Amino acid sequence: MGLAGLGVGALAGALALTPGPKVLGQAETLLEARSPNQRHNAKLACEAIDGKVIKPGEVFSFNKTVGSWSRDKGYRRAPVSFNGSLIDAWGGGVCQTSTTFYNAALYAGMELVERHAHHFCPTYASPGRDAAVAYPNIDLQMRNASEHPIEVSAKVEGSRLKITLIGRAAKPAITIQTRIIDQQSPMLLNQGSGDSPWLRSPGKPGYEVETYRITPESKVRLSRDRYPVMHRVVQWSNGS
């Protein structure tokens, strides 16, 4: 699957011709379909990692950098995926920031240490390209494997969440490839009885995917993820 089909923009340049700072990796995701509170929380997480300098050999921990998503830090309650269901919880929406950072880090050549997929595939990223976090136990960790520091720029620009990783390391071009092994379409399920319908679940396809990072020298499998199908459920009841 090409980059255009991933919904994540990225820049990963060829070998640098100058020793000055340059973009090593860049990714962006769209906030248009997110709730106001999800946008707010994603922006707060961006502010927490913006300006972070990752030293050579250092492991960047998203949870340690962002910290808890508590009310006293300004986070709001918003929909979050929990055990296969959507519930309102403090910090809902932060996973969009971790997902965007993950994609930028892949293009920057950072080494994957820890990453978790969501139970269901989120709308803002393609299958295999998401990175779920839940403070403090479910983390995203990436190691700076280069000999130079990497600086994080994380911004919300209109409806776009954009993360850029900047450094002096020379690196070859990197391609991220996602291979869909299996895909399941959601079914329409009617539940209850009556004359008044309401949409209980919008439904999402299910996927099994493998994701690879490709350089001129190698092709490395990053992950194999399974996302179950979420059926479209219409609940019927008697109108009041």
Where are these regions (language model features)?
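N-terminal Sec-pathway targeting helices
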Residues: 1-7
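Well-ordered beta-sheet/strand-loop patches within structured domains
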Residues: 7-240
